[in-house]
């Protein structure tokens, strides 16, 4: 795909832009205004260094050793030592997309101009992204305060020519990787090591990518639910605008509108409009209310991620002297202030909420799948488990087992990360565990996509039991056709794992919503 470049200015990075850089190798550049802000910030550090006052992380030790003064001759060594000592992560390595998300989100935070670094540091980060030099970063070790220290330290080691990096699929020492990309290692100066490793960027980067994916899953779930509505001979009367105008939650109204648009022109729905059924089961009738609540939860997370992507989250922060109170360290012209912007609680709580919401999305999707398959509840025109010659054949019985298993997993992933740990000699006595929350959310997205894919697979099979002369809605027909590109109708028992994987991948890649958008000549919200 052709991907436009992303301009880093510290103010306008979006989840979509993170996705473009992380997954599609969009090139990055630094805005002129950001460069000026960084230069001004570095000049303030130089001004502070000219005095005798203790300034945290500039001429002192770190954490519980912040009372230790560091001689001027040792300040560069202090920064390099910080990066080395904090590179103590464990566990599986971050995938390339997560590493690139880590790089671009840290770059954008530093570009705001409150971290006291030199432009040179920004330029090397840009070089790593544009030349495809990807630090090897273990996934575990962050407490979500002081930010994501260990992962960011592993990232930062590569800037100073240490550690390992992957280049074009080949692993090599960082010094060799930098040389291959015509990049020079950075000799860190005062404040720069601390600025690099202290922030929420692992949490934010992983959350941004997973949020993009989650919104795709939600739009695909609306599509799957619309197809199930048709195949089960249900009604879209419960999606009438009047119902949602008198309970005006934003997400609910959007999901109801989606169902109406997806099924517009459906001859299947028109065919049984005058039947005797008064109302449908909750899993179909309450789709707008449940999917809408999930949409609101994701919007809640999106607001936090959008803010965090463009925030200064390291500590201390560097300001003009007249912007802070008299107790701040520094001079009349510059102030270096300790704060807590590295604390990931705002993300941890919303990530847990969003993961819980995805568990509910998957749960209601699995219940609709049951109504397609279950001989006790399905409509008379459908065969048990959607199997031709049921009894001899089991049809799609077992894909529902897998969906139910994943729903059970999702319920545990939706638990909030509330455990605390006190570290660094009790100086850092409350942490957020936000990185763990981000990983849980990412896993929840992956599993929910499979559950929604199972519903789409079953909905497409259910279509085979309808009168072929009755057209589906324009949107649901497009989804059916897309499923049939990767999965043939089940005419007799066969292994369905590959079909499930293929349809799940359609959901993850956004291909379901793309097909629907083409058919409706408008994207789903």
Curated annotation (Swiss-Prot):
SUPFAM superfamilies assigned: L-aspartase-like
Post-translational modification: Contains an active site 4-methylidene-imidazol-5-one (MIO), which is formed autocatalytically by cyclization and dehydration of residues Ala-Ser-Gly.
EC code: 4.3.1.3
Subcellular localization(s) per the UniProt record: Cytoplasm
Keywords: Cytoplasm, Histidine metabolism, Lyase
Pathway: Amino-acid degradation; L-histidine degradation into L-glutamate; N-formimidoyl-L-glutamate from L-histidine: step 1/3
Taxonomy, superkingdom: Archaea
GO biological process: L-histidine catabolic process to glutamate and formamide; L-histidine catabolic process to glutamate and formate
Root EC class: lyase
Modified residues (2,3-didehydroalanine (Ser)): 146
InterPro entries per record: Aromatic_Lyase, Fumarase/histidase_N, HutH, L-Aspartase-like, Phe/His_NH3-lyase_AS
Gene3D superfamilies documented for this protein: Fumarase/aspartase (Central domain), Fumarase/aspartase (N-terminal domain)
PANTHER family xrefs: HISTIDINE AMMONIA-LYASE (PTHR10362)
Entry protein name: Probable histidine ammonia-lyase
Species of the source: Halobacterium salinarum (strain ATCC 700922 / JCM 11081 / NRC-1)
């Amino acid at each position: 795909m052709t991907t436009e470049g992303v301009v880093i200015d510290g103010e306008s990075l979006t989840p979509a832009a993170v996705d473009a850089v992380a997954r599609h190798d969009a090139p990055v550049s630094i805005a002129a205004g950001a460069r000026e802000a960084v230069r001004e910030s570095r000049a303030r550090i130089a001004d502070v260094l000219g005095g005798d006052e203790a300034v945290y992380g500039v001429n002192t030790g770190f954490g519980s050793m912040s009372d230790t003064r560091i001689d001027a001759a040792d300040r560069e060594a202090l920064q390099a030592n910080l990066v080395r000592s904090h590179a103590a992560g464990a566990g599986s390595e971050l995938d390339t997309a997560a590493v690139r998300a880590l790089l671009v989100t840290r770059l954008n935070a530093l570009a705001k101009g409150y971290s006291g670094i030199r432009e040179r540091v920004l330029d090397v980060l840009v070089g790593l992204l544009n030349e495809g030099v990807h630090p090897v970063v273990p996934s575990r070790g962050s407490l979500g305060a002081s930010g994501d220290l260990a992962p960011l330290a592993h990232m930062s080691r590569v800037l100073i020519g240490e550690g390992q990096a992957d280049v074009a699929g080949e692993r090599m020492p960082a010094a060799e990787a930098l040389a291959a990309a015509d990049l020079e290692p950075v000799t860190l100066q005062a404040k720069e090591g601390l600025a690099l490793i202290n922030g929420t960027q692992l949490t934010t980067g992983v959350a941004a990518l997973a949020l993009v994916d989650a919104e795709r899953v939600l739009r695909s779930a609306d599509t799957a639910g619309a197809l199930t509505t048709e195949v089960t001979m249900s009604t879209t009367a419960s999606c009438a605008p009047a119902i949602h105008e008198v309970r005006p939650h934003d997400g609910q109204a959007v999901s109801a509108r989606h169902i109406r648009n997806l099924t517009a022109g459906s001859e299947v729905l028109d065919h049984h409009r005058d039947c005797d059924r008064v109302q449908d089961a909750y899993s179909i009738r309450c789709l707008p209310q449940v999917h809408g609540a999930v949409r609101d939860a994701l919007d809640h997370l999106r607001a936090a991620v959008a803010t965090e992507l463009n925030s200064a989250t390291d500590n201390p922060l560097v300001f003009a002297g007249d912007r802070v109170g008299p107790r701040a360290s520094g001079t009349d012209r510059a102030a270096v202030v300790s704060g807590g912007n590295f604390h990931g609680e705002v993300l941890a709580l919303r990530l847990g909420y969003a993961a819980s919401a995805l568990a509910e999305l998957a749960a209601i999707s699995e219940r609709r799948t049951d109504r397609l398959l279950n001989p006790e509840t399905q409509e008379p025109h459908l065969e048990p488990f959607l199997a031709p010659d049921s009894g001899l054949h089991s049809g799609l019985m077992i894909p529902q087992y897998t969906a139910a298993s994943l729903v059970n997993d999702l319920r545990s992933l939706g638990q909030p990360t509330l455990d605390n740990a006190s570290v660094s000699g009790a100086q850092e006595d409350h942490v957020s565990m936000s990185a763990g929350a981000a990983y849980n959310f990412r896993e929840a997205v992956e599993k929910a996509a499979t559950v929604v894919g199972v519903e789409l697979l079953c909905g497409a099979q259910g279509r085979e039991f309808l009168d072929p002369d009755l057209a589906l809605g324009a949107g649901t027909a497009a989804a059916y056709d897309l499923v049939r590109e990767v999965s043939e109708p089940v005419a007799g028992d066969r292994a369905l794992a590959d079909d499930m994987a293929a349809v799940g991948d359609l959901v993850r890649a956004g291909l379901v919503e793309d097909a629907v958008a083409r058919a409706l000549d408008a994207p789903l919200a």
